[in-house]
């Protein structure tokens, strides 16, 4: 903060109040989070690409990828992100998991794809196939059991045929939003 009054009388005055500065851990930067293969029995790892600024992860072919994200899930936990796909696969999705094992209690959401998945929530399978980004907000705390999650999983499943599915995730954030205004509770002046 600066108060500058360079004229002869130098009578400038400023008041600053209720200022908080903190590191925001709710954004997922793929350049600083190791992107690993998820569950060796699922997918062949596929191919990944991370943008230089770390904001975007592309998973192609037949990939289930994971980043470590220790987070305490509460009923108000939300995940928001931009999603697009230019190559339709069988299953495109996102999940929160505690142990890197498929079908062992993870909370998984379908976003797009030709295959139905009875182990996934399909309420957010709304992507229109345009190849353009669409913003998605999922109130995961309403679906997941409260408790600790350790991983965020990014899915482009396409293990039949061409194996060329594509999922692109950008601007991924995980945070608590008690009052539903899509502002991280740690930053919300209303709380």
Question: Where are the model-predicted features located?
Answer:
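Short carbohydrate-recognition loop motifs
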Residues: 42-64
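Extracellular beta-strand ligand-recognition surfaces/modules
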Residues: 1-13, 19, 81, 92-96, ...
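Solvent-exposed strand-loop boundary residues in beta-sheet-rich modules
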Residues: 25, 98-102, 158-160, 178
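Short, tryptophan-glycine- and acidic/Ser/Thr-enriched carbohydrate-recognition patches
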Residues: 26-43
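Extracellular calcium-associated, cysteine-rich motifs in secreted modular proteins
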Residues: 177-191
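Solvent-exposed loop and beta-edge segments used for protein-protein assembly and interaction
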Residues: 72-75, 86-88, 130-132, 146
């Amino acid at each position: 903060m600066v108060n500058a009054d360079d004229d002869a009388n130098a009578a400038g005055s400023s008041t600053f109040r209720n200022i908080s500065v903190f590191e925001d851990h709710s954004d997922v930067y793929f350049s600083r989070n190791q992107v690993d293969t998820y569950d060796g029995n699922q997918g062949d790892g596929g191919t990944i690409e991370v943008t230089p600024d770390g904001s975007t992860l592309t998973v192609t072919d037949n990939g289930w990828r994971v980043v470590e994200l220790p987070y305490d899930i509460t009923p108000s936990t939300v995940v928001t992100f931009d999603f697009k796909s230019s190559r339709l696969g069988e299953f495109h999705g996102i999940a929160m998991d505690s142990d890197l094992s498929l079908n062992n209690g993870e909370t998984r959401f379908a976003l797009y794809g030709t295959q139905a998945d009875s182990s996934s929530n399909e309420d957010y399978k709304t992507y229109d196939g345009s190849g353009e980004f669409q913003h998605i907000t999922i109130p995961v705390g309403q679906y997941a059991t409260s408790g600790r999650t350790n991983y965020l999983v990014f899915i482009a499943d396409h293990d039949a045929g061409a194996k060329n599915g594509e999922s692109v995730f950008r601007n991924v954030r995980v945070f608590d939003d008690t009052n539903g205004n899509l502002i991280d509770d740690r930053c919300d002046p209303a709380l």
